[in-house]
C-alpha cells in the first residue's frame, strides 16, 4: 500500500458549513463532500482492453468491468467506465500496470467528490447539467462526462444519489452555485 504523506485540505474548506438552510426548514436537497477521495484513472491500450478490464474488476472485487458510461461497485470500491478505454477506480489503491498494457494516473488530489441527494436533487442538478437525469433514463450505475456551468465534470448515479467529481480548481465556485440554487428547495449540508 502506498503511504500518503501529503496533508489533504478540502477545496471547499472556506465555505463548508454544516446545517440546514433555506425554505422554512424543509429539506429538498442534501449536499455532502465525500472526504479523502482516492481516485485512480486506468487507461488501456486498445489491444489490451480485455486484460486491463479484467485487472480493474479484480482490483475492485467485482465480477466484470462495466461498459462505457456505467459503474459497478462492491462496498466502497467503485469502478467507473468514464471513456471506452478509461476507467476510474475509487476507494482503493491499485497496482501499477506494465506500460505495454496501459497507464495508471493518481487523480485523487485533482478532484473534489460531492454527493447530492434528496427528493429535489434531480431538479437541482438539471438546472446546470444538460442531461436527462430522470429515474428511467439515468439509472443507478450510470456515468456521464458533462458540463456544469461550462466546467467539465464526471457524474455517477450511485444507489444513494448523484456523485459529482468536480475539478479541484473549480470546486468552490460550483459548490457555491449548488448551495445558492438549493436554497429554494431547502437544503442540508452534512
Question: Residue ranges of each PLM-predicted region?
Answer:
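Basic, glycine/lysine-rich polyanion-binding surfaces/domains
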Residues: 1-190
Amino acid at each position: 500500500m502506498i503511504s500518503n504523506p501529503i496533508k489533504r485540505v478540502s477545496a471547499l474548506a472556506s465555505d463548508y458549513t454544516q446545517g440546514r438552510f433555506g425554505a422554512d426548514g424543509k429539506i429538498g436537497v442534501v449536499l455532502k463532500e465525500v472526504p479523502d477521495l482516492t481516485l485512480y484513472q486506468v487507461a488501456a491500450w486498445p489491444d489490451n482492453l480485455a486484460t486491463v478490464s479484467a485487472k480493474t474488476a479484480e482490483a475492485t472485487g467485482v465480477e466484470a468491468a462495466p461498459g462505457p458510461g456505467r459503474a459497478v461497485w462492491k462496498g466502497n470500491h467503485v469502478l467507473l467506465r468514464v471513456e471506452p478505454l478509461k476507467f476510474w477506480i475509487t476507494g482503493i489503491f491499485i497496482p501499477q500496470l506494465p506500460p505495454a498494457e496501459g497507464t495508471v494516473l493518481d487523480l485523487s488530489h485533482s478532484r473534489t467528490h460531492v454527493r447530492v441527494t434528496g427528493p429535489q436533487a434531480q431538479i437541482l442538478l438539471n438546472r446546470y447539467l444538460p442531461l436527462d437525469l430522470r429515474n428511467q433514463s439515468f439509472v443507478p450505475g450510470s456515468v456521464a462526462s458533462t458540463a456544469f456551468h461550462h466546467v467539465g465534470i464526471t457524474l455517477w448515479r450511485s444507489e444513494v444519489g448523484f456523485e459529482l467529481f468536480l475539478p479541484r480548481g473549480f470546486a468552490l465556485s460550483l459548490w457555491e452555485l449548488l448551495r445558492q440554487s438549493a436554497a429554494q428547495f431547502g437544503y442540508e449540508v452534512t
